[in-house]
From Swiss-Prot:
Lineage of origin: Bacteria, Pseudomonadati, Pseudomonadota, Gammaproteobacteria, Alteromonadales
Protein's recorded name: Argininosuccinate synthase
Keywords (A to Z) from UniProt: Amino-acid biosynthesis, Arginine biosynthesis, ATP-binding, Cytoplasm, Ligase, Nucleotide-binding
Organism in which the protein naturally occurs: Shewanella putrefaciens (strain CN-32 / ATCC BAA-453)
Known partners and oligomeric status: Homotetramer.
Catalytic reaction(s) noted: L-citrulline + L-aspartate + ATP = 2-(N(omega)-L-arginino)succinate + AMP + diphosphate + H(+)
Highest taxon, organism lineage: Bacteria
Pathway(s) per entry: Amino-acid biosynthesis; L-arginine biosynthesis; L-arginine from L-ornithine and carbamoyl phosphate: step 2/3
Protein's cellular compartments: Cytoplasm
Enzyme class, first EC level, given as a word: ligase
GO molecular function: argininosuccinate synthase activity; ATP binding
Length: 407
């Protein structure tokens, strides 16, 4: 179960700790394989739920950690990571709003800060050697703390299954509430929850009702729609139904409103960073409503070239976030450029929630470029349709010349 003790020199390790089976086993494993080093457990509160944090410190200490630091990152996560990313229009492979991906850089940053605070010389995570998260965490560590050693137990130990981990803990009389019958791998934060594994590994299987935990089944959702108003300033949601709220509070309120209507469910097969495809079911109720509202205002205020540019930035940003490149010059540049464009993204949107759908049905903005006087199909006094003839001749000039040359 262990490796040969070639790992000398590490004295203090900060472990990204969740209290789950993997990280519970990592604590004693580190002590056995890294010269009985001191383990500092670190848990990032990114809105995964209070129930996930209850008893966490006691569990970490019982497993062999000397300290447990639980850091509240909820407000910072929404304000400095979710809101800026959404302002770029980032959406991975046309579907995924990057709920897990956005959480990784803030967790990694906070883990490094704890390491500096306690004087650690190593960082440790419980990501598997098959997934994206190992790359995301270690990419952030490289940018923020290249001097610290990184330990990835799943790439070192010989344990391969949940049964192996349970046996390992039992041999050491370390109690755990985990079982070998866990079906799904889940990851939750304030923005979303992801579900992988179980029957989802076969793309021919429809997700069972037991997969979903945050949103109502759209088929069972209310038969009457609900309307929610969002006010946006500089590309950020500032009010929900007229109530001024902090970013985190706004997201929580929208989660509570949209989830009963089954809003925000997706079932995708995505291209992982490490080369393989994986299937995941994601629930993002409040974020889906926010995204719809931002898109609606952008339709009013961005001209054609600005909208095209924003879509290009969004596509690039989605890959940067998904691939763990938050702390890079390009990501910083895209965020800064999007801030400038977002200065005009102001207004109010009413979103209709009904059986899994979130549709913007009303929108207005003081910066709107839409003019009913110009757009009307009826009689108007501001647009001379004869002017279109000259524009069309110039617009199609290259095509005309090409056709003449072909004769």
């Amino acid at each position: 179960m262990s490796i040969e003790n070639k790992n000398t020199g590490v004295k203090k390790v900060v472990l990204a700790y969740s209290g789950g089976l993997d990280t519970s086993a990592i604590i004693p494993w580190l002590k056995e394989n890294y010269d009985n080093c001191e383990i500092i457990a670190f848990c990032a509160d990114v809105g995964q739920g209070e129930e996930e944090l209850v008893g966490l410190t006691e569990k970490a200490l019982a497993s062999g950690a000397s300290e447990c630091h639980i850091v509240d990152l909820k407000e910072e996560f929404v304000k400095d990571y979710i809101y800026p990313t959404m302002a770029t229009g980032a959406i991975y492979e046309g579907t995924y709003l990057l709920g897990t991906s956005m959480a990784r850089p803030i967790i990694a940053k906070a883990q490094v800060e704890v390491a500096r605070k306690v004087g650690a010389d190593a960082l440790c995570h419980g990501c598997t050697g098959k997934g994206n998260d190992q790359v995301r965490f270690e990419g952030c560590f490289a940018a923020l703390a290249p001097d610290l050693k990184v330990i990835a137990p799943w790439r070192e130990w010989t344990m391969q299954s949940r049964e192996d981990l349970l046996d390992y803990l039992a041999e050491r009389n370390i109690k755990t509430s985990a079982s070998a019958t866990k079906i799904y791998s889940r990851d939750a934060n304030a923005f979303h929850i992801s579900h992988e594994g179980g029957e989802l590994e076969d793309p021919w299987n429809e997700p069972s009702k037991g997969v979903w935990t945050l949103t109502a089944d759209p088929e069972d959702a209310p038969n009457q729609p609900e309307y929610v108003s969002l006010e946006v300033e500089n590309g950020r949601v500032t009010k929900v139904n007229g109530e001024a709220l902090t970013p985190y509070a706004a997201l929580m309120k929208l989660n509570a409103i949209a989830a009963p209507h089954g809003v925000g469910r997706i079932d995708i097969t995505e291209n992982r960073l490490v080369g393989m495809k994986s299937r995941g079911c994601y629930e993002t109720p409040g974020g889906t409503v926010m995204f719809a509202a931002l898109r609606a205002i952008e339709e009013l205020v961005l001209d054609k070239t600005s909208r095209t540019w924003r879509e290009q930035v969004g596509a690039q940003m989605a890959h940067l976030v998904y691939d763990g490149r938050w702390f890079t010059p390009l990501c910083k540049s895209l965020l800064a450029a999007s801030e400038s464009l977002a200065e005009s993204v102001n207004g109010e949107v009413v979103v209709k929630l009904y059986k899994g759908h979130a549709i913007a049905v009303k929108k207005r903005s003081p910066n709107s470029l839409y003019s009913e006087a110009f757009a009307t199909f009826g009689e108007d006094q501001v647009y001379d349709q004869k002017h279109a003839e000259g524009f069309i001749r110039l617009y199609s000039l290259a095509s005309r010349i090409r056709a003449l040359n072909a004769k």
